From Swiss-Prot:
Protein name: D-threonate 4-phosphate dehydrogenase
Catalytic activity, reaction form: 4-O-phospho-D-threonate + NAD(+) = dihydroxyacetone phosphate + CO2 + NADH
The keyword Heme is annotated on this UniProt entry: no
EC number: 1.1.1.408
Family statement drawn from the similarity comment of this UniProt entry: Belongs to the PdxA family. PdxA2 subfamily.
Cofactor field: a divalent metal cation
Entry annotated with the keyword S-adenosyl-L-methionine: no
Lineage of origin: Bacteria, Pseudomonadati, Pseudomonadota, Gammaproteobacteria, Enterobacterales
Function: Catalyzes the NAD-dependent oxidation and subsequent decarboxylation of D-threonate 4-phosphate to produce dihydroxyacetone phosphate (DHAP). Can also use 4-hydroxy-L-threonine 4-phosphate as substrate.
Organism listed in the record: Pectobacterium atrosepticum (strain SCRI 1043 / ATCC BAA-672)
Gene name as annotated: pdxA2
Classification via InterPro entries: PdxA_fam
Co-factor remark: Binds 1 divalent metal cation per subunit.
Length: 326
């Protein structure tokens, strides 16, 4: 039996519904074993824009009822409170609430074994918060729903892979909370993740915090007090890890094949190089959950929502990768 992937709609006022339809209606994923969790009426409104050739929406109650065939998209309906009031490209509380409910439903299905992985379309954090769900993003929400203590965001392309020590936290607060335990945990998670996806002997680089990785304490002492001891501790456990590496060169070295993954210290340190080099094919993966979760590596793109202009490549790759890793 094929592994079933739950695909969550994300914010319905963004490009999520469109990139899901484009991903599942055409190409390699047409007829794939994926079940959408989202608002049926919103999907119908997107289909009315003729973004793809004719496709059938099959409403199901549970994944076991799905019929996987070309031209068919299976969907478990999570209705909006007022679907006709939904407007594209605008922050709306009901859209944030729907995105939350879709994640909650998909997580319950995964924890029950009814689906084997989750691929998520982007949500809008402001809309999520306006609905009363005060999470920084998907990663933290999924960790809460699954009671996962140790987790990390991975950005994944064929040529560059990055895992983050911190993500949705103010840079000033990151510097105040950085500690050896977290750095060592993320290095270990990187090693486990890479082995899970097929690397037999992963090579992991750990980026420094400061310019030139601190230049032996000239530009900060986080490398001396935290990063270097963490790297040495993980080497003692048998992990092939290097660092602290200067952040301005380590990503190029990884891109050219010297390392299999970079441990980034904070959000933009990891996101900028990966989005520069792999914006359209990058995938976001949450390491440390009890199931595989992947996501398109971009936002809701409100400026082009419901226009037919959204590119589905990152969403399609995230679904394919979820199937591969499940």
């Amino acid at each position: 039996m094929s592994k079933i992937i739950a695909v969550t709609m994300g914010d319905p006022a963004g490009i999520g519904p469109e990139i899901i339809i484009k991903s599942l209606a055409e190409g390699e994923l047409s007829g794939a074993s994926a079940v959408v969790v989202g608002c049926v009426q919103t999907m119908r409104r997107i289909l009315a824009l003729n973004v793809v050739p004719t496709v059938e929406l099959k409403i199901i109650d549970k994944p076991a009822d799905a019929v996987f065939a070309p031209g068919v998209i299976n969907i478990i309906d999570e209705p909006l409170e007022d679907p006709q009031a939904l407007k594209p490209g605008i922050v709306q509380a009901q859209a944030g609430d729907l995105a939350y409910r879709c994640i909650k439903k998909a997580t319950a299905l995964a924890m029950a074994g009814e689906v084997h992985a989750i691929a998520t379309a982007p949500l809008n954090k402001e809309a999520l918060h306006s609905a009363g769900h005060l999470y920084p993003g998907h990663t933290e929400l999924l960790a809460k729903l699954t009671n996962s203590r140790d987790y990390a965001m991975v950005l994944y392309t064929d040529k560059l892979k990055v895992i983050h020590v911190s993500t949705h936290i103010a840079l000033r607060k990151f510097l105040d909370t950085l500690n050896r335990d977290r750095v060592e945990t993320v290095i270990e998670m990187a090693d486990v993740f890479l082995k899970r996806v097929g690397f037999t002997h992963p090579r992991i680089a750990v980026a420094g915090v400061n310019p030139h990785a601190g230049e032996n304490g000239l530009f900060g002492d986080e490398e001396i007090k935290i990063v270097s001891p963490s790297v040495e501790a993980m080497k003692a456990k048998g992990i092939d890890v290097y660092g602290p590496c200067p952040p301005d060169t380590v990503y190029l070295q990884a891109y050219e094949g010297q390392y299999d993954m970079v441990v980034a210290m904070y959000h933009d340190q990891g996101h900028i190089p990966l989005k520069l080099l792999g914006f359209y094919d990058g995938v976001n993966i949450t390491a440390g959950l009890p199931f595989i979760r992947t996501s398109a590596d971009h936002g809701t793109a409100f400026d082009i929502a419901w226009t037919g202009k959204a590119k589905p490549e990152s969403m399609a790759i995230s679904i394919q990768l979820a199937m591969q890793l499940a």
